[in-house]
C-alpha cells in the first residue's frame, strides 16, 4: 500500500474550502494526549517504588524520610517566624537552619540494622561453608579404594 493512500494522509490532504488548522490541532492534541497518558500509566508512584524495595532498604528509607520531614518542618517554622518580622530580608540575615544531619536515633538504628545484616551474612556464609564441607565429605566417602 502506498503512503499516499493511507487514511491519515488522506485526512490531512488539503481540500478546497476546508481549513487545515483544525486537523493539525486535532493531531497535536492526539500526540500530546497519548504521550501524557503513556507517562501517567507507565510511571510508578512513590508507594509502588517503596513497596518493591527489599526490607532493609525500605526500613532505612522510612527512617531517613522521617528525619527529612522533621528537618523540613523546623525549616518552615523558622521561615514563618522570620517572615512575621517587619524588617527587610537583607536585614534579617541568613536563616539559622543547620545542614541536614540525621538525629542520633536514626544513626543508632542504622548501626543496629547494619550489625544485624552483618550477623545474618556471617551466619549464611558459615552455613554455606558447612554445606560445602559436608558435600565434599560425602563425595570422599562415596569413592572406594579403587
Curated annotation (Swiss-Prot):
It comes from the Eukaryota. Residues 103-143 form a coiled coil. It is found in: Mitochondrion inner membrane. The chain crosses the membrane at residues 21-43. The keyword Chaperone applies. It is a single-pass membrane protein. One of its GO terms (biological process) is mitochondrial respiratory chain complex III assembly. Belongs to the CBP4 family. Essential for the assembly of ubiquinol-cytochrome c reductase. It has a direct effect on the correct occurrence of the Rieske protein, core 4, core 5 and apocytochrome b. This is Assembly factor CBP4. The lineage of its organism: Eukaryota, Fungi, Dikarya, Ascomycota, Saccharomycotina. The gene is CBP4.
Amino acid at each position: 500500500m502506498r503512503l499516499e493512500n493511507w487514511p491519515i494522509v488522506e485526512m490531512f490532504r488539503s481540500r478546497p474550502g476546508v481549513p487545515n488548522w483544525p486537523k493539525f490541532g486535532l493531531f497535536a492534541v492526539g500526540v500530546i494526549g497519548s504521550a501524557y497518558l503513556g507517562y501517567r500509566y507507565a510511571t510508578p508512584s512513590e508507594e509502588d517504588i517503596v513497596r518493591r524495595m527489599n526490607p532493609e532498604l525500605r526500613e532505612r528509607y522510612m527512617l531517613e524520610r522521617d528525619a527529612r520531614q522533621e528537618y523540613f518542618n523546623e525549616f518552615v517554622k523558622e521561615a514563618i517566624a522570620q517572615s512575621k518580622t517587619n524588617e527587610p530580608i537583607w536585614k534579617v540575615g541568613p536563616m539559622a537552619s543547620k545542614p541536614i544531619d540525621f538525629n542520633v536515633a536514626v544513626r543508632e538504628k542504622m548501626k543496629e540494622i547494619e550489625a544485624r545484616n552483618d550477623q545474618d551474612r556471617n551466619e549464611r556464609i558459615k552455613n554455606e561453608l558447612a554445606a560445602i564441607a559436608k558435600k565434599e565429605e560425602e563425595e570422599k566417602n562415596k569413592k572406594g579404594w579403587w
